């Protein structure tokens, strides 16, 4: 999901070159971190417009944290690739519809507006470059007029990236940064017909990857490996959605192998993949635009579960990717100690021993060293990444890595 003249050309060329730098492979190991989302559960003060704030929670819906606390409308959170920061949209003061792009840390500190867009224009729906060196965003004007822009992570060097033939929403780079996916409004008048497009990073090769006439095909998001796209649509394909409700779908990145994952009388929208191999999809589901909960299911549409059920509306979930050391074994968790996703590597480092070390570390008060293992920790907004290492007698490095949810 979403000014140019001669003096700025050097900066523009530099930014474009940075956008094409190689990125880490999508298969790099990551943990599934926290889920950030917008929520309208907090009532605005008397006389203020109804607005939302950004929260985060653990993948099971526990350990809820409120990350923004202001009377303006904070929406469309997007985690940085390293899981340390969140870009989001913040409504301009005294405006019901116009937004600016902003960012904050994973813990909800260091709030900073990145754009200052002259009225009646708006800058919204920021999404990180996969190499963390910039942000795409939607720049819009009166009505539906809009285009794809890019800027640095501090808001520097804003520039037009791509001007599509139709109004645009929810732009984002593929993991290898070779393509941009986005929603295009294709209805002759108003916003009643949307389609999903991809375009090459250089602005060529515009391709329609999903378009059902008269349907609302929107909110595309890349899978971690870039092979698939999840999206929302109210299309009635093969009479599988006769009521025309918004449902969650997936497809190959070229538009083939289209699959409808949800099928119910609710509005299912705004999907996001779990970072660790894209095995799950999180999304919003509710009876109408004023009510909705964050749900999670497998990437095949099974084992659906509601996270944080409550009255009101939660929307636009995005799943934090926490970098993880490469390991040979995935060992589960230690639920009694708030430890999950234990991973092990090294000679003699079997899962039983890895979980035992994690348990002992937690019971010992989470020290910097335990049983000869050096311990490094990093807090990422309430979830702590823990890495334990030491050299064995054979010189090979033994390693235990996991997430600690006790914070």
Question: Regions from the language model: what does each represent?
Answer:
Residues 92, 139, 285, 333-338, ...:
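Short acidic, glycine-rich loop/turn motifs
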Residues 325-360:
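Extracytoplasmic/periplasm-facing segments of secreted or lipoprotein envelope proteins
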Residues 345, 353-407:
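Extracytosolic low-complexity repeat regions of secreted or lipid-anchored proteins
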Residues 26-325:
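Sequence signature of WD/YWTD-type beta-propeller architectures
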Residues 2-28:
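Secretory targeting and sorting signals
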Residues 267-286, 348-371:
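Short, positively charged, low-complexity/disordered linker segments
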């Amino acid at each position: 999901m979403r000014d140019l003249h001669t003096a700025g050309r050097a900066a523009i060329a530099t930014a474009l070159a940075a956008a094409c730098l190689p990125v880490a492979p999508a298969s790099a190991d990551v943990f599934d971190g926290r889920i950030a989302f917008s929520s309208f559960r907090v009532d605005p003060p008397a006389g203020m417009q109804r607005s939302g704030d950004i929260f985060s929670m653990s993948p099971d819906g526990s350990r809820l944290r409120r990350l923004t606390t202001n009377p303006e409308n904070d929406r469309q959170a997007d985690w940085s690739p390293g899981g340390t920061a969140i870009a989001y949209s913040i409504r301009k003061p005294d405006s019901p519809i116009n937004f600016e792009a902003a960012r904050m840390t994973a813990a909800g500190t260091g709030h900073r507006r990145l754009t200052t867009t002259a009225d009646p224009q708006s800058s919204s729906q920021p999404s990180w470059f996969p190499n963390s060196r910039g942000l795409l965003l939607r720049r819009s004007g009166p009505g539906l007029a809009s285009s794809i822009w890019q800027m640095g992570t501090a808001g520097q060097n804003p520039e037009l990236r791509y001007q599509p033939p139709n109004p645009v929403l929810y732009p984002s780079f593929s993991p290898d940064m070779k393509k941009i996916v986005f929603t295009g409004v294709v209805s002759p008048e108003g916003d009643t017909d949307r389609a999903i497009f991809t375009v090459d990073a250089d602005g060529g090769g515009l391709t329609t990857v999903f378009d059902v006439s008269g349907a609302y095909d929107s909110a595309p998001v890349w899978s971690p490996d870039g092979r698939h796209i999840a999206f929302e649509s109210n299309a009635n394909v093969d009479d599988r959605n006769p009521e025309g409700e918004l449902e969650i779908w997936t497809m190959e990145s070229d538009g083939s192998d289209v699959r409808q994952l949800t099928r119910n009388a609710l509005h299912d929208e705004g999907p996001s993949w779990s970072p660790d191999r894209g095995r799950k999809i999180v999304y919003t589901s509710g009876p109408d635009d004023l009510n909705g909960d964050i749900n999670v299911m497998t990437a095949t549409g099974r084992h659906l579960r509601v996270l944080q059920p409550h009255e009101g509306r939660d929307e636009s979930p995005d799943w934090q990717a926490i970098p993880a050391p490469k390991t040979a074994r995935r060992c589960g968790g230690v639920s009694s100690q708030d430890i999950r996703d234990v991973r092990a590597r090294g000679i003699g480092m079997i899962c039983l021993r890895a979980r035992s070390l994690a348990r002992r570390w937690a019971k010992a008060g989470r020290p910097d060293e335990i049983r000869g293992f050096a311990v490094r920790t990093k807090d990422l907004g309430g979830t702590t990444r823990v890495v334990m290492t030491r050299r064995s007698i054979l010189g090979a490095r033994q390693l235990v890595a996991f997430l600690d949810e006790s914070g």
